[in-house]
Amino acid sequence: MPKVKRSRKPPPDGWELIEPTLDELDQKMREAETDPHEGKRKVESLWPIFRIHHQKTRYIFDLFYKRKAISRELYDYCIREGYADKNLIAKWKKQGYENLCCLRCIQTRDTNFGTNCICRVPKTKLEVGRIIECTHCGCRGCSG
């Protein structure tokens, strides 16, 4: 996979604090992409990629909105350079979507009956002892 060209502009102040974590997550992403998929179902081979993408986006979201540890300029830089998913962050800011695992789970066009994914069903409404896994990303329940 070719390296993505980043902007020529130097990153804002504070980048050196979050860069090691983002580099580590990028390395995990590369490992997940090259991981062999023998013995797994077709959909299971993408689950680690979705988890790492969620983890990287959640890291930047928490730094900016929860802990207020990075500046708006650095946050915008991370969004612009593709380190975080701005659409997923936009959903996390809405009530009821604070723990959303991925955007595919709320897209109704991907299902036969125009409904959300099984992981969006509250655990109180599911059968007791029933273990569910989302077919899109492997989530075990992100609605609460």
UniProtKB/Swiss-Prot annotation:
Chief place where the protein resides: nucleus
Role according to the record: Involved in pre-mRNA splicing process.
Subunit: Identified in the spliceosome C complex.
Gene responsible for this protein: bud31
Name of the protein described by the UniProt record: Protein BUD31 homolog
Motif Nuclear localization signal, residue range(s) on this chain: 2-10
Translocase in keyword set: no
Stated family: Belongs to the BUD31 (G10) family.
Subcellular location: Nucleus
Pfam families referenced in this protein's UniProt entry, alphabetically: BUD31
GO biological-process terms attached to the record: mRNA splicing, via spliceosome
GO cellular component, one term: spliceosomal complex
Source species: Xenopus laevis
Keywords annotated in UniProt: Developmental protein, mRNA processing, mRNA splicing, Nucleus, Spliceosome
